[in-house]
Amino acid sequence: MRYITAGESHGPQLTTIIEGVPAGLPLVADDINEELARRQKGYGRGRRMQIETDQVQIVSGVRHGETLGSPIALVVENRDFAHWTKIMGAEPLTEQEEKEMKRKVTKPRPGHADLNGAIKYGHRDMRNVLERSSARETTVRVAAGAVAKKVLAELGITVAGHVIEIGGVEAKETTYRSIEELKSITEASPVRCLDEEAGNQMIKAIDDAKSNGDSIGGIVEVIVEGMPIGVGSYVHYDRKLDAKLAAAIMSINAFKGVEIGIGFEAAHRPGSEVHDEILWNEEHGYTRRTNNAGGLEGGMTTGMPIVVRGVMKPIPTLYKPLQSVDIDTKEPFTASIERSDSCAVPAASVVAEAVVAWELATALIEQFGLDRMDLIRENIEKHNEYARGF
């Protein structure tokens, strides 16, 4: 599978075209809208989320609630475009209109794509950069991820994300009896945290940052249960599933680090305390005593839950802006202020779920793929039976 997105933050709409989704997948707009609504929630979001109520329109590739096997096109309208029609319109402006335009950006914000993108593409108005580099684009990435999640769910695979740290406040209680319990608890938490006490402290940290005109980041974790053994590859570096997952997490706006399983903690332990001992029983076949590898070894799945974490830096748009330089006058100035969140970590956990789900669904279709969901399901069932008795 593959997809491409298009659209600007304050343009008319966001669009994604998805290719390679098998025929026969049950899919309706509500499957996607539920994920879009989850992305818009979360403590610390800005005023933009009060304007937009994201709803998807499926314009191709689905008929009567089932995928056809042809490309799926999804559209999400930007309601805020009504206030930006002149500034973000496709038609040229008159000389007078250009002079009157008050939204030209010449003061790059530290931490954003503004300056680098303007230099790369030769834009004197950095709005041309920030409109596309905005995290608003993750709306349609979540939409694509919702389709991937639906593929996984049909194959008995569950994806759940949660927040384990915000602004230095770390969740202490991260145990759960089932992945469904994990989902239930985090959906009820304003910061998507399993630890209620830590969640309250996270809310306070967000409030403190907002009152100071600042922003804070954090760490999210995605857990996936139900993946078969041996998905991915050790044969080529670019087909290793852990490499693809790491790239997917790092592709999310403002993410600066990723780890799988115990991750960087492995540097502090001897090998005897890192590697997962292999067990076998008649009911389940091969399993592991521990899951320090996070469900991935040698670029392939082990059959244990996949555990991926990502580090999100504080959002660089600040209400007490940092020092910058005006690209027209070269004079020092405080950077431009754009409407923004004070913390987007809870929402980012939903985006992380989406990109992880996409990579796993793609890997499954590559390995077991045919053009129909029922045949893919049969292939996976045969593979699981084979692996149990191997």
From Swiss-Prot:
Listed GO molecular functions?
A: chorismate synthase activity; FMN binding
Superkingdom: Bacteria
Query: Which UniProt keywords are given for this protein, alphabetically ordered?
Result: Amino-acid biosynthesis, Aromatic amino acid biosynthesis, FAD, Flavoprotein, FMN, Lyase, NADP
Name the residues that bind NADP(+): 39, 45
Q: What is its EC number?
A: 4.2.3.5
Keyword Transmembrane helix recorded: no
Biological process (GO), any one: amino acid biosynthetic process
* UniProt-listed SUPFAM superfamilies: Chorismate synthase, AroC
EC primary class: lyase
Q: Which GO terms describe its cellular component?
A: cytosol
NCBIfam families for the chain: aroC, PRK05382.1
Q: How does it assemble?
A: Homotetramer.
Tell me what this protein is called: Chorismate synthase 2
Source organism: Bacillus anthracis
Q: What is the lineage of its organism?
A: Bacteria, Bacillati, Bacillota, Bacilli, Bacillales
